[in-house]
Amino acid sequence: YTIQEEGPKDGPDMLRILEPNDRLPGFRNRYFIWRYDLQTGLYEQLTYGHNNTFINDVSADSRYLLFSTSEQDYTSLPHSSNSMYKLDLQSMAVDTLWEKAQYINGATFSPDGKQLMVFGSGNAFDNIGLNIKEGQISNTYDGQLFLYDPATRKAKALTKDFNPNVTSAQWSKFDGQIYMLTEDQDYQRIYTCNPVNGKIRRLDLPEDVIYNYSLAETAPVMYYYGQSVSNANRLYSYNTKNNKTQLIYDLSADKLKDIKFGEVHDWNFTSTDGTVIQGRYYLPPNFDASRKYPMIVYYYGGTSPTNRALEFSYSMHMYAALGYVVYTLNPSGTTGFGQEFAARHVNAWGDKTADEIIQGTEQ
């Protein structure tokens, strides 16, 4: 676990700003890793120093701790670096796996502790996972997955040619597969990746947007929950061996009792540069095709896709219930459509995005 230590304070007469983030509360505080022995009751501090230390993982046999530090570097992209260390909790020997590496977000142990599953962007490990056009700058919000061998210090890209954005992953102890939660266009889906041959397979699961999942360690069982374009959350169990799904609890049936929604239709168009832009529209309940309705166009100005979830801050059905047709789309620069598509967001300043939104609205 980690404990926060309060950092040094400036005197009352003068403030020294060490860097831009020093203006934020708590910037000088530091987090360090401690261990508590349940048998002896001993508290022991494992890390200290100038930088924060973060727990990444503990090996299955509890012998090794994987922890990292990060440092700011405003002279080059992505303006931060990551160092990863493997601590032997018996001998207290530290193995430095990499220092001041860029574009790496974190790592976890494989079930046998011999490899690492590393999260980062395509630029990590000297660009081995990069898949963009010449002249583009990668979108670091587009997550990629790597295998790293601590013995050889070599890494392998697992998702270089995989379009969905990997947001999280778990390495199953039971079947040895890596289960990845992804942004897959306007869906959130779970895929498996075979770490031996790199083969990726999508799990055929109910619900458009899966929020979270949990894997059993000693059985072919996964629990997950999610929702879709016109229903709230439902909880399921999934057998990873025979691929069968069972509904455990339908929260949506309780929450949406006596609520009527309008229809939702997918609608894509091809922009002037030949790009297919994905979108959908929502109709009011009791929609009358002979009438004219005002239309609301919703788009997110960031880089994440507007997914198919029913419940979020700007629910499309809520606006449709007020008598509007609601159109939403995922223009160039959105994650979940491949690295090249996501990279269009960088230094674009909305020019291409605005054109596509206008084109879709007019069509």
Describe the residue ranges of each PLM region.
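Short loop/turn segments that connect beta-strands within beta-propeller blades
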Residues: 37-41, 88-92, 149-153, 194-198, ...
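Predominantly a core beta-strand signature of beta-propeller blades
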Residues: 42-45, 92-95, 154-157, 199-202, ...
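Blade-terminus and WD-like Trp-Asp/Gly-His loop motifs, strongest in beta-propeller folds
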Residues: 56-64, 107-115, 169-177, 214-221, ...
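Serine-hydrolase catalytic core recognition
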Residues: 212-363
